[in-house]
Amino acid sequence: MAKEKPILNVAFIGHVDAGKSTTVGRLLLDGGAIDPQLIVRLRKEAEEKGKAGFEFAYVMDGLKEERERGVTIDVAHKKFPTAKYEVTIVDCPGHRDFIKNMITGASQADAAILVVNVDDAKSGIQPQTREHVFLSRTLGISQLAVAINKMDTVNFSEADYNEMKKMLGDQLLKMVGFNPDNITFVPVASLHGDNVFKKSDKTPWYNGPTLAEVIDAFQPPEKPTTLPLRLPIQDVYSITGVGTVPVGRVETGIIRPGDKVIFEPAGAVGEIKTVEMHHEQLPSAEPGDNIGFNVRGVGKKDIKRGDVLGHTTNPPTVAADFTAQIVVLQHPSVMTVGYTPVFHAHTAQIACTFMELQKKLNPATGEVLEENPDFLKAGDAAIVKLMPTKPLVIESVKEIPQLGRFAIRDMGMTVAAGMAIQVTAKNK
């Protein structure tokens, strides 16, 4: 059997009207991942509902409710092959109320494609676009490319393309720490397929790669197999005749049958009996693998979602308190000492209290603007000291970046995102 192509997870980010789902649908179709008959059927359905042109988007928007609203809600995963990779697309939602999904979606991505509407050069960069790029950066995505879409609406004008490209570079990418010179921009018309998989004859002034070629130029992720084992628990099942079976995704390290393990903050200790993926037993599992495993000596009631598994020789860190760098995305008022919103870190959701506001930073450069500010508001970046109200596993991003990032939610929205830069471990 031929060696399978490496998998690359690519997040598609950007404003809801930029044509992300259509871009993704076009990649899937031209990449041979969709039966063309399906597109014909969806086109008919789209026309009947008065949404002609939405047929590619329908491929990603599998949920019926989304189809009627024309909005992508859950994070949809679809695959297509390029010359080099088996690409898994993480189609991140665009609407504000789905930013939480964006956070859980983007953190699984190795690279991101920002899709923008060329017409935004006239109206300015959409706030959502800023937020998505900023979040992607905060969540550790360092590889980014930009698809400037809907080029057909400006007659494939090079001037409009260059104006949009300059605006994105000056007003967005530089601000969040991406160097525009290292980012590939592609003029596309996803609805018609121009420069997505196939070179377009309508952009003779553009001699760069197609979007599919840009994806092939991304670097594959290095699996963090040498870091300590960390596996956040998503669910715990009790299976008759087998016993307790926790499931989750290996974030770092390697897990094997026979390993002595500990779940934190639960403190439950056991031994791995078997490791399974897709109903097959494995001799070991590594980062990125979604697995179920059977543990000797641990009952279903001993552990829960949000616990993190590690080896007994290097247990996950339970934080007494931690210092973090955060970015306030949106907040109706201000954040002060004593504020206690819910932190979403890996699979855990725990309220944490702001103990100290140590420094306010320039979000674009990281330089200190103010020591010990009285409050933080939307748009601020800061260094803060936090204390979990219940036991929480979190690691410093310097040591185990996969377990150092978090989102802060309050009032039904994501108010901030950040990363732990120093963690004080709880004494046992």
UniProtKB/Swiss-Prot annotation:
Domain of life: Archaea
Catalytic activity, as annotated: GTP + H2O = GDP + phosphate + H(+)
Name this protein carries in UniProt: Elongation factor 1-alpha
UniProt: Mg(2+) binding residues: 21
InterPro entries named in the record: EFTu-like_2, EFTU-type, G_TR_CS, GTP-eEF1A_C, P-loop_NTPase, Small_GTP-bd, T_Tr_GTP-bd_dom, TRAFAC_GTPase_members
Species of the source: Methanococcus maripaludis (strain C7 / ATCC BAA-1331)
Organism placement in taxonomy: Archaea, Methanobacteriati, Methanobacteriota, Methanomada group, Methanococci
Family annotation (CDD domains): EF1_alpha, EF1_alpha_II, EF1_alpha_III
Pfam family, one: GTP_EFTU
